[in-house]
Amino acid sequence: MITRPVAAALSCRQCRSAILRAVVSRPTASSLRTLPQRQARQLPILTRRFFSEEKTIEPKGERVAEVLVTPDNAPETKDTAESDDVPWFLEVEPPRHPESQHKVELPKIPEDAPEVIGPMIKYIFEDMGLDDISLLDLRDLDPPAALGPNLIMLFGTARSERHLHISSGRFVRWLRKNHSIAARADGLIGPGELRTKLRRLRKKAKLLGTNTAIIPGGDNGISTGWVCVHFSSSGDNINEAASFDDSGRFSGFGAPQTGTTVVVQCMTEARRGELDLETLWQAILKKNLQENKKARGEKFADAEELNKVLASKIQLPSSASALQWQAMQKASQQHRSYSTSARRLSPSLEREQPASNLLNEEPEFAEEPVVLDLALVQKHIQDIQLIGTPMTQEMLYNLIKGAMMTPSPNNAAKDRLSLVDQILLTAEERGMEIWNDEMFVTLIEAGLLSPCYGLEIQRAQKNLEYLMKQKGCQFNGDQVLRLMNAYAYQKDWDRFWDAFRMPPRFKMARESQHYELAYRAMALTSSQKMCIAALRWVYPEMMSQDPPILLVSPLYDSLKACLTVADPGALTWMHNASETKLINLRPVQRRRLENREFLKVMREVESIRAELMRAGLVQSESGALHQ
């Protein structure tokens, strides 16, 4: 008989359903019991295989055999054994990532450096995310740099302006929290400082009644792309103490220079390339090492020894691609079998050639042995910029001529113009006068006579000519002659005649060299049309000029050559007018020949020449040859 509690339980529908399922369903206790075991056995294997570089997938048959041998799995059915297999998408071998070909090599920690340098370099690379980290050990500078004694300087490149300020601020807080170092960050803009400054700038512009100074999306010069974090390992404690000399006498008070000054220069890529502080400090350290050796009565054996010492002090970032490019550049350089040390530019360097000798087919310096090399010019400019070599006004003009006119295997106009920009910027920083008449003439002349004259130099030439007109340059006779010669070399006849007309614009008389160059340039073209057009207005102006121009030998020869090109038969008719063949011509033909335009000009020239010879102002050709 069913007891009352059982009957009460059977009266509930849910309890009745549970009892029926327990009695009627198949026993699955073993499968339910083995499920956690299978998961516990398989999941660590799958996890280890997914994150490992080695293939740890076991053969399918071994896993099946292992499951069958297990006592707990003995009563399982065929369906349970098949469900124990690993799915197909888990049997795929995980991808293997190849090792990076360009491993970043962090700078090595110098000897006797503060303990904070090691973790600091690691933090700068991993947490701050700065690239191209370099380290300069400047503790040997004597006297020390203005930044502090025993200087160690690091450089890093930030990805953007925002990255620069955020990472620099975190770096200062990291030093304060982990190493108890109170570092200063010059140029750092705080999180809300930029917004505050821009708001003040907008308010100021609104009060002034103009908003044109506000650039949308810009910082308006508030940020510089450069944050300098610096601190000293000795802290801010400065102990003043009395100083005594070698004899024991009191010499004053002072604080001994102790500790190490650490400077971290964080810059954007553009700012770092613009300043190039590594090259500047490298030149300073090199010069200081040489001077200290010389003061002790010693010197480096050779340049290689000095470079080894510099390499141990300066660790610059290097990559495989950069090293390969440097090797290619070094292999492509020309090696000369003679010394070029005595061929430096000097203030007393003469002009390469007179301005009147540049009308040949090629410039004169191309026919002589190479006097200057473009690499030497570049090195000289770097010495002026980095070391501070003195520079005079004449040396400035010679450097510009050397940068533009020196022959080079790679005639890159862009590189030459960049050199000129650098030397002009250096001269302007030193307070030298650069925008005068001589500078305009030198720049235009050097560009026109450059072996790489092309579109880029033409663009720069047009800009210079525009500035020249705006400034109202008043050139002297020699400068006008140089401009005419340079334009004639490039066969730019419009600008050639424009330069020829410059003296009358400023109420100045032309010199005989101007007319001689004009006649000779036209004669060298062998163009009858150009010679006729030039003679019809140049010759009357020459004859009416006050003071008059004497037909001396160079001018006379050039004018005669130009007349011969304009009228090839004039010279023949003038000297052979009495021949029978010409006498037998009809009167109309004879008058036509006698009244030719340039035949009259040639007769006039010959008569003037004869008068000068009778007056003794000009020697005859026979007398000149005899002398």
Curated annotation (Swiss-Prot):
It is a peripheral membrane protein. Disulfide bonds: none annotated. Keywords: Membrane, Mitochondrion, Mitochondrion inner membrane, Transit peptide. Probable mitochondrial mRNA stabilization factor. GO terms for cellular component: mitochondrial inner membrane. This is ATPase synthesis protein 25, mitochondrial. Residues 1-51 form a transit peptide. It is found in: Mitochondrion inner membrane. It comes from Fusarium vanettenii (strain ATCC MYA-4622 / CBS 123669 / FGSC 9596 / NRRL 45880 / 77-13-4) (Fusarium solani subsp. pisi). Residues 336-355 are annotated as: Disordered. Belongs to the ATP25 family.
